[in-house]
Structure formats: C-alpha cells, structure tokens
Design a protein with these regions (language model features):
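N-terminal leader segment of winged-helix/HTH proteins
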Residues: 1-32, 87-88
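Short, cationic-aromatic polyanion-contact patches
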Residues: 28-37, 52, 85-108
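N-terminal helix-turn-helix DNA-binding core of bacterial DNA-binding proteins
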Residues: 29-62
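Basic amphipathic alpha-helical segments that dock to polyanions
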Residues: 45, 56, 67-77
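Short Asp/Glu-rich motifs
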Residues: 48, 76, 93-94
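Glycine-centered, phosphate/nucleic-acid-interacting loop/turn motifs that mediate DNA/RNA or nucleotide
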Residues: 78, 84
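Amphipathic alpha-helical dimerization/coiled-coil segments
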Residues: 102-137
Length: 137
C-alpha cells in the first residue's frame, strides 16, 4: 500500500503507484468541500473503470460503509450509474459502478456546488457587514 501525505492516498495496485496529479486532484476536491471518500471513489472509477464495491474498497483503501456513502453522493450528483450483476449462486446481486461521463464532465457538479457555496458566503459577508454598520445595534 502506498501512503501519501494528508492521507489522500489511493491504494497502490499491481505495483503502480498513484501519480502526483491524481493526489493533487483528490486534495483539491477535498479543499472544495468534497468528502475524501467521494473524491477517492470518483478518481478510482476514472482510473480503473467500472468497479464493484469490493474493488472500490481495495483500490481506494476505504471501508465498505464509506464506499456506500460515497456512491450515494456520486449517484445524487448523477455522475455514477450502477448495473446489477447476478451473483454466482445465492445471495444478493452485486452492483458494478461506473462514471456517466468523462472525468472532466463528472467534476462539473462539484465545481457548481463550490461556486454556489462561494456565492452564499459572499452574500452572507455583505449582509453581516451591512448589519454591523447600522447604528441601531
């Protein structure tokens, strides 16, 4: 396993380590407010293609509940779709997750949310400054 600074690492697979641009992409998404598990799953799906939950756990070095939360967020943003694959024998069918577009297309919802957050913060600052200037406080 390859451990990178700030614990934004992806699991090293087949002797291939995560590149610096991949780590920068993940850390930048996290700085924008994206949950780390969500960013890791998005990038793992981009790098490794359609993957099961177990594969995402291994490639992203995260636990199953974290994969589920990340996939739910990615589905909410409509950047991931899932296909059921019949299990061999008994049990629940497993799901294969894949991106709905290119990485560039899939990061758009995250950028839009970050820009909306910026607008909200700027508006709140302006309101706060206006309220603080009034003489009736």
């Amino acid at each position: 396993m390859l451990v990178m600074e700030d614990s934004y690492s992806l699991l090293e697979t087949n002797g291939v380590s995560s590149s610096k641009p991949v780590q920068q992409l993940i850390s930048t998404m996290i700085r924008l407010g994206v949950q780390s598990h969500t960013a890791k799953c998005l990038i793992c799906l981009h790098l490794h293609g359609p993957s099961s939950s177990i594969t995402l756990q291994k490639n992203c070095n995260i636990r199953q509940p974290d994969v589920s939360v990340a996939i739910a967020e990615l589905r909410r943003l409509e950047v991931v779709k899932s296909d059921s694959s019949a299990s061999s024998g008994r049990g629940r069918p497993s799901h294969i997750y894949q991106l709905t577009g290119t990485l560039e297309e899939c990061i758009i919802p995250f950028i839009v949310e970050a820009k909306n957050n910026i607008s909200t913060i700027v508006s709140a600052i302006a309101t706060l400054e206006g309220l603080a200037q009034k003489d009736n406080i």
